[in-house]
Each structure stands twice: as C-alpha cells, then as structure tokens.
Amino acid sequence: MDVKNSPSSLNSPVSYNCGQSILPLEPGPIYLPSSYVESRHEYSAVTFYSPAVMNYSIPNNSEDGPGRQTTSPNVLWPTPGHLSPLAIHCQSSLLYAEPQKSPWCETRSLEHTFPVNRETLKRKASGSSCASPVSSPSSKRDAHFCAVCSDYASGYHYGVWSCEGCKAFFKRSIQGHNDYICPATNQCTIDKNRRKSCQACRLRKCYEVGMVKCGSRRERCGYRIVRRQRNSDEQLHCLSKTKRNGAPMTRVKELLLSALSPEQLVLTLLEAEPPHVLMSRPSAPFTEASMMMSLTKLADKELVHMISWAKKIPGFVELSLYDQVRLLESCWLEVLMVGLMWRSIDHPGKLIFAPDLVLDRDEGKCVEGILEIFDMLLATTSRFRELKLQHKEYLCVKAMILLNSSMYPSATASQEADSGRKLTHLLNAVTDALVWVIAKSGMSSQQQSMRLANLLMLLSHVRHASNKGMEHLLNMKCKNVVPVYDLLLEMLNAHTLRSNKPLVTRSERNLAEDSESKEGSQKPQAQ
C-alpha cells in the first residue's frame, strides 16, 4: 500500500470505518495527513483519505515521478562540444536552481531552506524544544544546561540558557571593566570546573554562544522577538506577492539571500567546504618532473571540488554562467593557495599540499623557480599564524577572494551593471559575516577594526603569490616539463587569453594615437 502525505488543503478529515463504508474506496495510493506524519506522538486511530473520495485525480505514474515536472532549461543548452569543461561544470548547477514541484507536495516554510544555528540543531536532534522557559524540574530530560560552562542552567539569561555564575559574570563584564587579557593563547577550555581560570576566554565564549545585552530578561526582549517574527512574515508575504505579480526572480532571490543572518551564512560556508584530496607521495628523491606531476595532478583534482564549493555559496549560482566562469578563472589559484596556507598554519616551515603530500622548503630546490614561490607561501602562512586565524574567518576570507576577483567587463553595459550589482550584494553579505565572526571574539571595537584590516591586507600577498605561481605554471607548460590536461589546462589557457587581450588593446590604442598625431602634424604643413 502506497502511503503519502495528504495535501495541506484537506482540512476536513473523513473517517473510515472498516465495517461499514459510506463511499466506495477505489484502489489507489492512500494519503496520510501531514499532522500525523510530522508529529512525534503515536496515535491509536488514523484517518485515511482516498483521492477518489476527495475528487482528486491520481497522478500518472508512467511519467518521470508522480506529478513531477522539471523546469530545467537543460534542453535548450548546446551540446558539450561547444562549451569549455569549466562551463559544463558550472552549467550543471542550473539543474538545481528551480525546485521540483508536485501537486501532492506540501509547501514548506521558507525557514526550513536556510541553515539554522547549532543550538536549534541540538534542540531538533534531541527532540526537545527550548522555546518555552517553563520546564519540569522533576524530570532530568527537561533540564537545560549552561551554554558557556555546561553546568545546569538556572534560566534563560542574556539570550541563552546559562547558570547563575555565567549570568553574573557576563553582567559584570558588560557593565564594568571587561578588558581581560588571556595569559595563554586565547584558547582556554571553559567548563564547570575551569570557568574561573581565564576571564578573557570566558567572556569570549559568552559572545560565541550568543549572549547579548538585550537578552537580560526574556520578557524584556519579547517585543524584539515578536518584531523579528513579524518582519520575517512580512518578508515572506512580499516574496509570495512578488512571485504572483511576475516580478523578476533575481529580485526575489536577492531577498532570500538578505534573509540569511551572518551566522547562517557562516554555517552554509562551513557545510560547503570541499573534502581533502589524497595524493600518493612520489618516491624520494624528488625530481623536477615528479614534483610538478604531483602538484599539477593535485591542482586538477582540487579544481573539481572548488567548482562544487563555489556553487554552494548562497547566491553564486544565481549569477549568469558567464560571470561564474569569469570569477573562477580569475581566482582559482588564489583559492587553492589560501587553502594550502590554512592547512599549513599549524606546521611551521612545511607546506601541507595534501594529508599525504607534505613538502619542506628545501625540497623545492629541485624545481627551477619554485623556491621563491614556496618562500612567499610560507611567509604569508606565518603571518596568518601570528594573527591566530580562526576557521570561520578563513571561510569568509576564501569566499571574499572568489567574489572579489571580477577584473574583466561583461559583454554589454547593461550586463555589466546587473552583474556588478549582484556581486556587490554577495560580497557585502560575506563581509558582514566576517565582521560578525570577528565581533564574536570579544575584542574591543578598536581591536576588531585592526584585525579586519590586517586580514584584508594579507589578501594582496595571496594575489602576489598567485601571480608568481601562474607565471611558473605557464613556463613549465611551455617547456613541456609536465603534461597539463582537463580543467587545469582550461584555466591556464583562459589566463593566457585574458592576459593577451589588454596588450592587444593597448597596442591598438597606441597605433591610433600615433596616426592621429601624424595627421595633426601634416594638416598645418598643407595649409
């Protein structure tokens, strides 16, 4: 028997009696009300619906899925032979741009399409709701724990469940002196037994778990919660109204992106992280050919994962295919290098290209010209290590490198303006997420500004190392030291074409200026 969710519009259940049936029950799928499916309680009696009773036609199962129709424009695309490998990789993302629809599927709330914070995930996983402050003290299942030190929570204080000790500590910190300094590395463990050992790390963790000044009383912040819910409902109403009126979908998708909070965006970037690529280390000693073969194979594998990572960034697949390819071609080596720096940040003097491919600086001497690039990578990694770069900061910085790599104009002026507006919107969202991550560290406003500036200034060093690496790869390709295939070859060819275009344009402009100057000098002589 095929059991499915009933449409949400069926609000009047018709009881079914096995002994005496008023209406004949035709054979077909049986639809189970969603209230029974989604509830966690067990019911002794369940009401069933038949499509024939409710005058609904059964979808034809001979088609591809029950009542499912794809709106994918895949049939309109040219064959892969007319597109580059990178365009084919990016083009597949459009298959998932529009969700599949079915006449028997319920309309999900928009909030389920966005990532939620860890506290919400914990509550959903445990099956208990923390939305209500009323809990039974007699049952340990309903007991809440302090989000800071994991002790038993006394209530909902400053926006989170916390104990009396952490509540009082946070109150003293926000009302008085809070310029605490960690005697260690700002990574102290804060738990029930060691929460008093370091005030700086305790305050930092208070901010990390979400403590805010306005959350001192749940009732006092009630109007903020209601107002936030009202704004969310109004935004959803505007989105549905915009869709009904046939407004451009780009505006709707921009509103969806703006609905993401910085925390949700960071969690999305965390989920989008590509997996580690394993490479077998060649037998020692290294030669120029063996090392370059290992590095180019690794880069080609990482490029495939990098395209998948880019498509998971909120709003990236909403860009045109041309813009997606242009951004990836402009920054692919920078993204790979900043990932290399993050893997090597805890290993001074070493470059962790892969978990099984670790190179020392001196091992680069076997390849002509690569030792200078190794030194640049190690120097920038050392600077990130001095700043104690955090993982969430690294996620935001890597996304900023991708979205800030647009250096070439679009085909037309209108396309240039539209793509510039979309990219600016995406870049602002990622920048807000980076600012939010730095603010959660508990530093003063001046220290936060300095840290943001230091992180952004290091991006120029990453770009410089990328330019050197690109030049070295092109030289190795021209000398036929190592064969280059697939996506890596496509990226190198795109870089060659783009770097030659400005030179041709500049030479043509110089020739035009010379001809104009000659004509201007000949006219007075003729007179």
Swiss-Prot record:
The keyword Protein transport does not apply. The keyword Metal-binding applies. Residues 146-211 bind DNA. One of its GO terms (biological process) is cellular response to estradiol stimulus. It comes from the Eukaryota. The modification Phosphoserine is found at residues 84, 102. Transmembrane segments: none annotated. GO terms for molecular function: enzyme binding; estrogen response element binding; nuclear estrogen receptor activity; steroid binding; zinc ion binding. This is Estrogen receptor beta. The gene is ESR2.
